[in-house]
């Protein structure tokens, strides 16, 4: 946890794959030291947008198909959508490092056994008013031998039981931390991948100023 807290920057793509084909990609540059982000991806109309903003006040600039947006209302909308994308995608990528965030409630639910593995199951819930979706609930299946999460189940806001689930695969060292870079959604031909994951010491300033940047 302390190693993650000291990480200055984090870079990744949140990729949705359905039936073996990529259907969406959202690119993230998170300057954790200075509290700013760049989030790129398709909007609801299929146009490529980029939101560059500070997390503290959600102020910044926006681009649509590589052209700077000047309408303040549209800039605010793009940034808000980018912020919500950042909240969702970073949580999926690094949830093990957010277990002790303010407003998180965690308890030991039970242990479960398969023929080969014993799991300690942790239940996560949230204090009302925490985050964007405080009614979400998660169950983490922690492999007692490896101490890694093998899968999770969740009931998200507005969802009725039973829980949905996903396996946590491809645990990989990214800089000084380990992350699961692939989630296989239970009962659906869908995978979530975290590609181009990196933990650089800093980003080029062009990332937070220009309409387009390289990886």
State each model region's role:
Residues 57-136, 157-162, 211-215:
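Flexible, processing/modification-adjacent segments and terminal tails
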């Amino acid at each position: 946890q302390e190693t993650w807290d000291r990480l200055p920057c984090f870079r990744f793509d949140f990729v949705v794959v359905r039936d073996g084909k990529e259907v969406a990609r959202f690119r993230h540059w998170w300057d954790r030291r200075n509290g700013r982000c760049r989030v790129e991806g398709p909007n609801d109309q299929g146009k490529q947008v980029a939101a560059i903003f500070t997390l503290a006040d959600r102020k910044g600039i926006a681009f649509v198909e590589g052209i700077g947006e000047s309408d303040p209302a549209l800039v605010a909308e793009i940034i808000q959508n980018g912020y919500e994308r950042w909240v969702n995608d970073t949580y999926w990528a690094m949830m093990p490092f957010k277990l002790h965030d303010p407003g998180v409630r965690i308890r030991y639910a039970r242990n479960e056994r398969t023929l080969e593995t014993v799991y300690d199951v942790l239940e996560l819930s949230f204090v009302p008013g925490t985050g964007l979706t405080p009614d979400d609930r998660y169950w983490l299946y922690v492999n007692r031998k490896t101490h890694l999460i093998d899968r999770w189940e969740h009931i998200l806001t507005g969802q009725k039981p039973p829980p949905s689930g996903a396996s946590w695969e491809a645990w990989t060292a990214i800089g000084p931390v380990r992350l699961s870079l692939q989630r296989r959604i239970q009962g659906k031909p869908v995978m979530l991948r975290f590609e181009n994951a990196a933990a650089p010491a800093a980003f080029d300033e062009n990332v937070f100023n220009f309409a387009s940047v390289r990886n």
